[in-house]
Curated annotation (Swiss-Prot):
It comes from Azotobacter vinelandii. This is ATP-dependent Clp protease ATP-binding subunit ClpX. The keyword Thylakoid does not apply. ATP binds at P120, S121, G122, T123, G124, K125, T126, L127. Residues 417-440 are annotated as: Disordered. The lineage of its organism: Bacteria, Pseudomonadati, Pseudomonadota, Gammaproteobacteria, Pseudomonadales. Belongs to the ClpX chaperone family.
């Protein structure tokens, strides 16, 4: 370059001026605009490398469902919906920098599709999402909507969700931006009904409003120190590519669906419609629409951020029985492993398993009720077991009493003492009547 010429950017040729400062190097200069462009190019290279690392982990929806089948029993429709949604989401991210396909002739920007899951407590909502995140190998964060508050209230603000996701990613912003966030108990953010009038929960609606931009896609500034002050260094997390999944029990939602699809019978006498058998909750929720969620109390803008809606079915006795024994980490397998660590073999009879499933149905807490019943039945045995080195086996069985009652009892087998007999364990039994009274 001629020394008589004005200094200019070696990349774009922009001349140095009060508004265009230049950074000088050994053999040239660069302006601020070209620095930003270079940063975008280098960042794109890094993103492509991350895409290549994630690409081998992207499997087909069929493969995702097979993995979910190993951990979650039943819920076929929900598992298929989640598998397709997750596959499409990460397929979109892997091809975001790809050249336009020849059939379209232009680049089409794909919008992300967040997911809302409705279903009774204990049906596997959290387990499904956590399992998918583990299969994908992406950061995962879970937030309880009941702890979130809008600005000006005491509690966790919505930005704390991204802070947890960033922590799960080890502080790597790029990795966090490909993560999954699960917001549980979103039904608690809905309006509350009192008497004949619907009273809107101001705090809950405020949280819904605060979540809108984050769920849709925005830049969230997170302090590296975790504390908010003027001097703390910040990290910027773009939420456009974060998959948000919301879940909740939505008690009473089935009644809203029923009132929509089954109008009241106002006929009299011969004009009255014949009474039909009331549909089950699962049949009603198969007809769930966004309008029903709005009627429940979620604002339309919040519902619109979750275009994919799926329902998890209420668990019946047969499904609870399978949950006890079939999954990879089935509850019975866990307790057998726990006993095996202490050199004791645990056997649970079929009659006991059926009784445990019955009691879980009475508690109305889904799969969580199974652990509660089994823990109560084995608690005293587990208390005494470390102090009984001669103990070699335990059998949990259902005992029928003369008065018609039933209870779970543990029979223990000691080390060889010449008789090899099985004797009752001095453990309190779990009686059917006590479980019923507790539920009432």
């Amino acid at each position: 370059m001629d020394k008589t010429d004005k200094p200019c950017c070696s990349f774009c040729g922009a001349e140095k001026s009060p508004t265009v400062p230049l950074i000088a190097g050994n053999d040239g200069r660069i302006c601020e605009a070209c620095v930003k462009l270079a940063h975008q190019v280098v960042s794109s290279w890094g993103q492509r490398r991350k895409n290549q690392q994630l690409a081998p982990q992207l499997r087909t929806p069929v493969e995702y469902k097979k993995h979910l089948d190993e951990s979650v029993i039943g819920q076929e429709a929900a598992k298929e919906t989640l598998s397709v949604a997750v596959y499409n989401h990460y397929l979109r991210l892997l091809n975001c920098d790809r050249e336009p396909v020849c059939q379209l002739g232009e680049q089409v920007e794909l919008e992300k599709s967040n997911i809302l899951m409705a279903g009774p407590s204990g049906t596997g909502k959290t387990l499904l999402v956590r399992t998918l995140a583990r299969i994908l190998g992406v950061p995962f964060a879970m937030a309880d909507a009941t702890t979130l508050t809008q600005a000006g209230y005491v509690g966790d603000d919505v930005d704390s969700i991204i802070t947890r996701l960033l922590d799960a990613a080890g502080g790597d912003v790029q990795q966090a931006q490909w993560g999954i966030v699960y917001i549980d108990e979103v039904d608690k953010l809905a309006k509350r009904s009192g008497g004949g009038t619907a009273v809107r929960d101001i705090s809950g609606e405020g949280v819904q409003q605060a979540l809108l931009k984050m769920v849709e896609g925005t830049e969230v500034r997170i302090s590296k120190s975790g504390r908010r002050n003027e001097h703390s260094e910040e990290q910027v997390v773009d939420t456009r590519n974060i998959l948000f999944i919301a879940g909740g029990a939505f008690p009473g939602l089935e009644a809203l669906v029923s009132s929509r699809i089954q109008p009241k019978n106002t006929g009299i006498g011969f004009h009255a419609q014949p009474r039909r058998e009331a549909p089950s909750i699962n049949e009603l929720m198969a007809s769930l629409l966004p309008d029903d969620l709005h009627e429940f109390g979620l604002i339309p803008e919040f519902i619109g951020r979750f275009p994919i809606i799926t329902f998890l079915q209420e668990l019946d006795h047969a499904t609870l029985l399978r949950i006890l024994t079939e999954p990879r980490n089935a509850l019975v397998k866990q307790y057998k492993q726990l006993f095996a660590y202490q050199g004791v073999e645990l056997v649970i009879t079929d009659a006991a398993l059926n009784y445990i499933a019955d009691q879980a149905l009475i508690r109305k807490t889904g799969a969580r009720g199974l652990r509660a019943v089994l823990e109560a039945a084995l608690q005293q045995t587990m208390f005494n077991m470390p102090s009984q080195p001669q103990l070699r086996g335990c059998t949990l069985d259902l005992v029928e009493h003369e008065d018609g009652g039933r209870s779970l009892e543990v029979l223990t087998r000691l080390a060889e003492d010449g008789s090899g007999r099985i004797q009752p364990d001095p453990s309190p039994v779990v009686e059917e009547k006590s479980a019923l009274s507790a539920d009432l």
